[in-house]
């Protein structure tokens, strides 16, 4: 596998949950958009969503992906364990958020992942996933993997 896309808690509710922040696209819509781009670029992509921190950590530890795109959602601001999982596997990842976490409540402005991420994309709604995938493809091509 080339790219793993991980979505954290409550992202299974996209399309209906706080559309003023997250838009009207569902997670399935976003995944379908990414799948089309991946196919056009001969990239193998897999998708995973969980509301449970430990399951996300297990997925990070077990993946054979060359690069990970993650929207950790609320775990962004709380999970030292997810941070430690990324440090343990030593693989590049791109942190993504639909909303700009720096334009939200104060507690949402701290990310436990940003400083160790290959890159971060915040505030572009569902298009942020597309931007992340394009950069993941660029990374794979740059590394010649």
From Swiss-Prot:
Keyword tags: Amino-acid biosynthesis, Aromatic amino acid biosynthesis, Lyase
Role played: Catalyzes a trans-dehydration via an enolate intermediate.
Reaction(s) catalysed by this chain's protein: 3-dehydroquinate = 3-dehydroshikimate + H2O
Pfam families assigned to the protein according to its UniProt record, in alphabetical order: DHquinase_II (PF01220)
UniProt cross-references to NCBIfam families, sorted A to Z: aroQ, PRK05395.1-1, PRK05395.1-2, PRK05395.1-3, PRK05395.1-4
PROSITE patterns assigned to the protein according to its UniProt record, in alphabetical order: DEHYDROQUINASE_II
Pathway assigned in UniProt: Metabolic intermediate biosynthesis; chorismate biosynthesis; chorismate from D-erythrose 4-phosphate and phosphoenolpyruvate: step 3/7
Gene Ontology BP terms: amino acid biosynthetic process; aromatic amino acid family biosynthetic process; chorismate biosynthetic process; quinate catabolic process
EC main group: lyase
CDD domains hit by this protein: DHQase_II
EC numbers on record: 4.2.1.10
Site for Transition state stabilizer, residues: 17
Family recorded in the similarity comment: Belongs to the type-II 3-dehydroquinase family.
SUPFAM superfamilies per UniProt: Type II 3-dehydroquinate dehydratase
Subunit structure: Homododecamer.
Organism: Francisella tularensis subsp. holarctica (strain LVS)
Record-listed substrate binding positions: 71, 77, 84, 98-99, 108
Active-site residues, Swiss-Prot/TrEMBL: 22 (proton acceptor), 97 (proton donor)
InterPro entries: DHquinase_II, DHquinase_II_CS, DHquinase_II_sf
A GO MF label: 3-dehydroquinate dehydratase activity
Originating gene: aroQ
Protein name: 3-dehydroquinate dehydratase
């Amino acid at each position: 596998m080339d790219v793993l896309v991980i979505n954290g808690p409550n992202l299974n509710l996209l399309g209906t949950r706080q559309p003023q922040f997250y838009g009207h696209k569902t997670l399935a819509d976003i995944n379908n958009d990414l799948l089309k781009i991946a196919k056009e670029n001969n990239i193998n992509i897999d998708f995973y969503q969980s509301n449970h921190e430990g399951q996300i950590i297990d997925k990070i530890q077990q993946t054979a992906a060359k690069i990970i795109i993650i929207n950790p959602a609320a775990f962004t601001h709380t999970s030292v364990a997810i941070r430690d999982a990324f440090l343990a596997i030593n693989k590049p990842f791109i942190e993504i958020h639909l909303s700009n976490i720096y334009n939200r409540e104060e507690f949402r402005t701290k990310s436990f992942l940003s400083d160790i991420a290959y890159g971060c994309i915040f505030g572009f709604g569902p298009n942020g996933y597309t931007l992340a995938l394009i950069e993941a493809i660029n990374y794979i091509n740059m590394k010649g993997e």
